[in-house]
Structure formats: C-alpha cells, structure tokens
C-alpha cells in the first residue's frame, strides 16, 4: 500500500470520519478554515485517491459520492509498519527508545503500554 501525501491523507481522514459515502461538498465543509481548497483541487485529490485504489466513485442523482475502499485501520497499520521498517530497522525497542529518550513518553503512557503488553501476553 502506498503512503499518501499529507493533502490526500487529509481528504481520506475526512471520508473515514464520515464512515459512509460522501460528496465533495461534505468534504469541503469539513476542511480546516485555514486550509480551504478550491473545488477543483479537492476533485483532483479525489481522482488521485480513486486511481490509487483508496476510493470508489458512484452517482447519487447528479452528485458523485466517494466511498473508502481501504479502511483507516488497514492504512494506519501499513504506515506504522513502514515507519518502523524505514526509521527503526523493524525494531519496536528502537522506536520506543526514541520516544522515551526524547522525553515524549509520560508515566501514563508507560502504564498504558505495560497494560497493552500484558493484555497481548494473556491472549497468546
């Protein structure tokens, strides 16, 4: 699965948030005020996402409606694995060390991580 540029990911996040087929107008209304895009730019992103296999397009009257083919969880898992592979040599330990050594993990984060690991161990 290909990594999406930030602009296309922003569009996909909106579509995933709706969790149903959406129109360009609905996408446009959800974009940040600071980041207003022209209708043609949005349509261009939607066309690219369709070409990449992320979206399918159907008609609802005169309007095109866009549905996600790839769900958010699948994309996030693939991207997480890609980041882990590229930046941390597939090492979860190296990834966590970077977070911890950079003071990006709070005590609460560590407790949640311990609880998650314990839950995974019990399921094995």
Model-derived segments and their meaning:
Residues 57:
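Short beta-strand "wing" residues that participate in macromolecule-binding interfaces
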Residues 53:
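Glycine-centered, phosphate/nucleic-acid-interacting loop/turn motifs that mediate DNA/RNA or nucleotide
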Residues 14-18, 30, 116:
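Short amphipathic alpha-helical elements of helix-turn-helix/winged-helix folds
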Residues 43-47:
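Short, hydrophobic-biased segments on the C-terminal half of alpha helices
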């Amino acid at each position: 699965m290909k990594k999406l540029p930030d602009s296309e990911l922003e569009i996909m996040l909106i579509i995933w948030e709706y969790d149903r087929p959406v129109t360009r107008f609905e996408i446009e209304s959800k974009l940040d005020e600071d980041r207003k895009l022209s209708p043609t730019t949005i349509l261009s992103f939607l066309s690219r996402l369709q070409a990449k296999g992320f979206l399918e397009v159907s008609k609802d009257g005169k309007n095109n409606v866009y549905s996600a083919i790839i769900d958010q969880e699948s994309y996030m898992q693939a991207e997480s694995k890609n980041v882990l592979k590229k930046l941390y040599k597939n090492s979860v330990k190296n990834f966590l060390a970077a977070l911890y050594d950079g003071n990006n993990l709070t005590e609460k984060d560590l407790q949640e991580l311990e609880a998650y690991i314990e839950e995974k161990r019990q399921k094995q």
